[in-house]
Amino acid sequence: MMVDFSPSRRRMGTQELSLKPQVETPGIKLLAVMFCRYHLIRQLKQVQAASRTRYAHSVPQSRPTLKERLAALHEKQQLSLLPPDAVKRVSENNPAVLIDCDARTLLQLFLAALQTDPQKTTLSELLSQEEGFSVFIHRLLPTYTPSSDLKHLVSKDGTTALLQKLYGFYREQFADAPIGRPSPGRLHDANSFARWFMAESKLRLARTVFAELVGNPTELAKLPRDTETIITLLQLHLGAKHIFWRDPGNSVGRGGQLFTPAHMAVVTAYNSLGEETLLRLLRLLQSDPQWKSVCSPDLDRNIILALAFHNRLDLVHAQAARYYAPAAPGHGLPSTPLLPDGALVGAVVTAFAFKHQLAQGLAIAYQFLDRFTHLPNEHELWKIIFTWLARRHPTGSQGAALYDEAWSKMRTRYAEHGQPTPYDYSIARASYRIVRRDSSLRRVRALLNDYMSPLYQQPAVAPRDRLLLLKCQAHIVGRLVRARRNSAAADFVDQWALDSEARSHLLEHIAARASSRTDADDDDAGDGLYLTGAPLW
């Protein structure tokens, strides 16, 4: 049988496909081959047509995007003609305006707006004064101290790039260091830049800023006698920034074992100028009359942390005792008329707790509380104490005694001042970790009744507070059900459920616990975490 398909031709692009007469070929096999080739060519042509269609539609769609970019650039240029309040308002309402600007566009935009300031008539007059850049920084970023305030201006991971633009522009304007000691405005700018870079864990950049704007950190006598500058020196070169410390044992797990992460912040190396340099600085501050004027509680707090970094806990104790006891004969540190605050006392707790001597640190902190009836920022002290109790909590009766003493002293201090104990999430979270680890139903009930009850008076509860509250309640419910006190668990839910949704979750938890009848230790799933679907920490 002979079949002639010669008139049939198909094209795929530039390649011609034809089926020539086949002689003595079975008809079914030939028809199958023809069918497959026909559909293959048809599909290829459909793909080509779709590609041409997409290309045709892509050209006109790019034009509005180009127009939008031109309009955005025009908007950036027009901002320079607005008064400072308008520039601030536009930048807050439309942060994207500042994201893609280069250094010159971003910075000149605000400098042009500063010309409308009645106190600075011209830009040249503004830049001729060293404090001009401080004014510029205040206008650019009104709340500039923590670098997290920069994150709404830039895209993700772009904060450091913006800081480098700011610093590069600053060096262009004030390239030459002034003769003699830096002015207060220049020191203010140097400390701001150095702390910005430290907040981004860029220690090398921060140290470069300090060396270029302040001076050689090893030449202590030539450094300016300025409190904030000495604090920056302690944090950059003498170990006072404790978030950069390498922690040999960060947290206590079940059974008392320690979890040991590598360190608490991602930095290459947090090296120091050495203990001798720190002690020379300490002698200057304690004995030189010209240096005594820079002393402050914040400076002493950083000195305490720097001493702890160099394992000089004896000097930490002596430095702290200057506030509440006569001078120690061994070290000869004079007493001080300064009033400590909660952050300073918290630094003492951090210094000892980091070296796994939490009990000694708490004992010193309680001496401060006995000596001073009122401490400024005392709430910060309690946050630090309970955070370290959760991280360094000893097992057994010793850990329970430390927690009970701290809990009692905190409530007593606020009661003596006629104030209710204020709720704080970090304290509640740390306390729950402690009492849950101790499997103490009494302490969990006290945490819920005495500390977390103000949440019921709030019109809206934050999600993290609600989750922590649900965890505490689920822990109590689980303990009651394991003791086969299902009715008591149901009564507890009726009394303490925050809302109808929480009540239904807890009732489901009762049913699940009652059906399992497990006597195993509580875990995250057993405490009701599976009901919320979100981790607590």
From Swiss-Prot:
Query: What quaternary arrangement does the UniProt entry report?
Result: Binds to the 5'UTR of the OLI1 mRNA.
Q: Which gene encodes it?
A: AEP2
Subcellular location per UniProt equals: Mitochondrion
Physiological role: Required for translation of the mitochondrial OLI1 transcript coding for the mitochondrial ATP synthase subunit 9.
Presence of the UniProt keyword Membrane in the record:
no
* Keyword Cytoplasm attributed: no
Report the main location listed first in the record. mitochondrion
Q: Which family does it belong to?
A: Belongs to the AEP2 family.
Q: Which domain of life is it from?
A: Eukaryota
| Gene Ontology molecular-function annotations | RNA binding
| GO BP terms in the entry | regulation of translation
Instruction: Cite a GO CC annotation.
Output: mitochondrion
What's this protein's name?
Answer: ATPase expression protein 2, mitochondrial
The organism named in the record is: Eremothecium gossypii (strain ATCC 10895 / CBS 109.51 / FGSC 9923 / NRRL Y-1056) (Yeast)
Instruction: List keywords of the entry alphabetically.
Output: Mitochondrion, RNA-binding, Transit peptide, Translation regulation
